[in-house]
Amino acid sequence: VSSIPSTTPKTPSRKLGIPLVLTAGIFWSSGGLIYRLIDEATPWQVLFYRSGALWLMLCLWLVIRYRLKTKQIFFWAGLPAVIGGLCLAVAFTGFILALEFTAVANALFILAAAPFFTALLGRTFLGEQITRLTWACMMVAAAGLAVMTGGELALGRGLGELFALMAALGFSGLAVSLRTRQGTDMLPAIFFGSLFAVLFAAVGIALSDSGLIVTPIDLAYSSSMGLFQVGVGFLLFTVGARHLLAVELTLLSLTEIIAGPILVWIVIGEVPSLGAFAGGFLILGAIVTMALLGASTPAARSRPVS
């Protein structure tokens, strides 16, 4: 999410931006825990109500924020927002399915590698250059992924890790699609993403013959994932991101990856495997290294990104 382009504010305030982005990461980190608390609903039902709640929230927010200019915002966002939304729907779907088939820590650590997939897609489709530092960090992250997925595959598992990779690629596709039109507001892309995810979920529900009826508590949990875990987290991030540098956003957003497994560990006792710890350490180390050393350029130091 930290690649969202927007207008830089005239008077950025780090004292405001830091707590907002940290809080956004905490909201995002709650997804794994909430999913584990769901009792009977299938992954497709969770995806349906999670994405539906987010879509309804965005409809309301777009009308409040843009009023009569809402149509113009969608027109200006154009095809990149639609393609980005499709990628985001793939990411939403992959994330929920990953939580169903693997540990929360595994899913989140693999999602943390999304910036490296973004770099590869940016090079392939936009001709963006990849620095030697980024290549080196990508190799370290790839080693981390191999440690995590290799251990699971050796045990005859690994489906959840593949879904997490799908989610990471989806988020990367969103970032690259938005780069094709600098300054694009991310709201239309998330609008389309949540709508497409509802459609994906509807197909999954139809094929699995699970229906739309869930228990009230599962409905509450699923909807809260859309309203609070994604929705409120995104709104906090977009406000806070206007006041921070790209490197700060990258590092502060890691609260999601760190807090997510800890929450599940403390509340329900889901302990990550040794392979997940080792692989996650390599991935997080690569991200921190790239963020800190990559911030040595004047542009990275001086320009807040949102």
Language model: regions and residue ranges:
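Transmembrane alpha-helices of multi-pass small-molecule transport proteins
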Residues: 2, 40-90, 117-118, 170-174, ...
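Cytoplasmic-side transmembrane-helix entry/capping segments in multi-pass membrane proteins
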Residues: 18-21, 75-83, 129-141, 160-164, ...
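Hydrophobic alpha-helical transmembrane segments of multi-pass membrane transport proteins
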Residues: 23-30, 34, 61, 82-97, ...
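Glycine-/small-residue-enriched transmembrane alpha-helix faces in small-molecule transporters
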Residues: 2-48, 86, 94, 143, ...
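Juxtamembrane helix-entry segments on the extracytoplasmic side of multipass membrane proteins
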Residues: 13-17, 40-48, 72-78, 145, ...
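Hydrophobic transmembrane alpha-helices of multi-pass small-molecule transport proteins
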Residues: 58, 62, 88, 130-150, ...
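C-terminal transmembrane-helix exit sites in multi-pass transporters
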Residues: 60-62, 97, 114-136, 146, ...
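C-terminal-most transmembrane helix of multi-pass membrane proteins
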Residues: 51, 150, 218, 254-306
